Amino acid sequence: MQGDDGAAIIFFFMFLFMAFAAGVQLRYFFAVFAAIILMIPILWNYVFAEYQKQRIINQINPEADPLNTGFQQIQGKISIGSGKIFGQGLFNGPRVGSNSVPIQESDFIFSVAGEELGFIGCTLIILLLCLMLFRTLKTASMSSDCLGTYICFGFFGLVASQTIFNLGMCLSVLPVMGVTLPFFSAGGSSSACLYLGIGLIQSVYIQRDDDDINAIISE
């Protein structure tokens, strides 16, 4: 039985962003990361399970076991590269159609996008997610109270970390950790959390409008 390492890491980054929004000084963040780096030998020898160690080793050299533990990342990279600039066409990817890409509907959906939509489609996906993140931060800056700011920064941390980790998995920059691409991967609970987050962000924005109206009336 393998734990949900990706979710734990994402919650950790959400906490960091919310702590930053709360005004925690940067030196404490540096201290936390320094402590984590110093603890790496202890974590590796006494905390990490064997499958976790194997994922990290596979990320460094997936070609060492291309038919077993390194299969996912190798096939994901090949699919992304096969799309070139404009892609093979939506639903026309030969590797996707033959199920050569593992977990293509969720964890490796970006590899599917790379094959079928090409560099142009992948760039558009990234730009759309960046636009959402920008709008989230803008809403945070307009929030009328601290709670709204914390909500916005927490949602920003959720989407940003998920995006970075998923792209890192598909490009073999990070180990496979079962993280989906926000708003594009299939997944009931993941999608529900994301849309719930959108609703909370909208609530923060609407509350800002209500406060502006009340201020105008009081004047």
Feature-to-residue mapping (PLM):
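Lipid-exposed faces of alpha-helical membrane segments in multi-pass integral membrane proteins
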Residues: 9-17, 33-39, 120-131, 153, ...
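Loop-to-helix entry and N-terminal half of a specific, functionally important transmembrane alpha helix
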Residues: 138-178, 184
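Hydrophobic alpha-helical segments of polytopic membrane proteins
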Residues: 1, 5-45
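Membrane-proximal intracellular helices of multi-pass ion channels
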Residues: 123-126, 135-148, 212-219
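Hydrophobic, glycine- and aromatic-enriched re-entrant/interface helices and adjoining loop segments
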Residues: 28-124, 144-148
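Interfacial segments of multi-pass membrane proteins
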Residues: 9, 14-28, 94-121, 179-195
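A juxtamembrane structural motif centered on a specific transmembrane helix
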Residues: 166-219
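Structural signal for the C-terminal ends of transmembrane alpha-helices
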Residues: 16-25, 131-140, 201-208
